[in-house]
A protein has these predicted regions:
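Hydrophobic h-region of N-terminal signal peptides that target proteins for export
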Residues: 11-19
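Sec-dependent signal peptide recognition
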Residues: 3-9
Length: 386
């Protein structure tokens, strides 16, 4: 949910924080490739009680826009600039680039270098100068080849997470592995799950703070971006509903709830459906694709649990009342590789060795983006409205 006018006024907003008599803490929580209607407070059936409670006490934006893709949206969010001005007009650096090899995402012009340039300052750099502690946990995706591009060199005091754009939730490794501050980490031992670990480190950074200065915490989950990997107990909460109802009924139920909530008005029409109707699928296809959606929903549900864990920590430590909390997504739901029934094999779901596909597919992505057209990487509402 990267709103254009927020981004363009972000430095001014941060400056006002820095001059305030009682500076608020700022917690910025970003999810990855989540659709407009996925969470409960926007009409979704996915169980997100903590995010819903946060929304009920705050402000929900219904026309909040982004750049339609992960790293350009993050570049704008961190700098308050159009993504080309910051150097990431299309994609960030390839995690598997060889040493002394030019990144395929460096197009040789300033707007398409694939990493944050030095013609911009980040929110973290501005807030740090204004007396804030600055912490980050999660997905960076703003440059990785050379420490000068890493979070600690762009204003953050502490960092734990991935520099790349995606990883295995269960065993991040290699070019998609973990980094703590400026140190690459070995592959973690099982049991491990990125959503939990990122939240634990975010809490740890705040908890280790020795003074009473305000803090800026950027918690950037890699969920629910592919690969489909979730805890079995969470998956089981959703398998029945998607198999029994299917995507046509789920989509219509979301539209009705969104209308009742005032997210959309009663005259809003669905974008044209680009897939088969649920009843046109074979029973085997229904089984497989319903399971994919259940895993996706479980990923979102785990994010909600961890949002609750962070908020509980802040409340118990008397920090919540003076904390501005923002929850947003980098872009719309992802249909990659644009196959109706999803990418990769069902047997690859929850394989720790997978750091890319499997994914949940074009049809469920369109449900996630109810009532909009298209998906991530497209300049339609389904890509840019989150």
């Amino acid at each position: 949910m990267v709103k254009k006018n927020f981004l363009m006024t972000a430095p001014l907003l941060m400056a006002s924080f820095c001059s305030a008599q009682e500076k608020p803490n700022v917690v910025l929580i970003m999810v990855d490739d989540m659709g407009y209607s996925d969470i409960g407070c926007y009409g979704g059936e996915i169980l997100t009680p903590n995010i819903d409670a946060l929304a009920s006490k705050g402000v929900r934006f219904t026309q909040f826009y982004n750049t339609s893709r992960s790293c350009p949206a993050r570049a704008s969010l961190m700098t308050g600039l159009y993504q080309h001005q910051a150097g990431i007009g299309q994609m960030s650096e390839d995690p598997f680039k060889q040493e002394n090899q030019k990144s395929p995402n460096d197009w040789g012009v300033p707007g398409y270098k694939g990493f944050l340039n030095r013609n911009c300052v980040t929110i973290a750099e501005v807030l740090k100068e204004g007396g804030y502690h600055t912490y980050m946990a999660g997905k960076w995706h703003l440059g990785m080849h050379g420490e000068e591009k890493w979070p600690l060199q762009r204003g953050f005091e502490r960092f734990y997470g991935i520099l790349a754009g995606a990883c295995s939730y269960l065993r991040p490794s290699g070019g998609r592995g973990l980094t703590l501050d400026n140190t690459k980490l070995p592959t973690p031992e099982a049991p491990y799950y990125t959503t939990d670990a990122f939240t634990d480190y975010a809490i740890r950074f705040v908890d280790e703070q020795k003074d009473d200065k305000p803090f800026f915490l950027y918690l950037a989950f890699n969920a629910p971006h592919w690969p489909l990997q979730a805890k079995e107990e969470d998956i089981q909460k959703f398998t029945k509903i998607y198999r029994e109802k299917g995507w046509d009924e789920i989509r219509e139920a979301r539209r009705k709830r969104m209308t009742k909530m005032g997210i959309i008005d009663s005259s809003t029409e669905f974008a044209e459906w680009e897939n088969r109707k649920w009843d046109e699928l074979t029973e085997q296809e229904k089984d497989k694709v319903a399971y994919r959606m259940a895993v996706y929903a479980a990923q979102v549900h785990c994010v909600d649990y961890n949002v609750g864990k962070l908020l509980d920590y802040l409340k118990k430590n008397h920090k919540l009342d003076n904390t501005l909390v923002m929850f947003l997504s980098d872009n719309g739901a992802c249909a990659e590789p644009y196959a109706e029934l999803g990418g990769g094999k069902v047997s690859e779901i929850n394989d720790p060795a997978c750091s890319v596909f499997p994914s949940y597919g074009r049809a469920w992505a369109q449900v996630s983006n109810t009532p909009f057209r298209k998906y991530k990487c497209r300049s339609y509402e389904g890509g840019i409205s989150t």
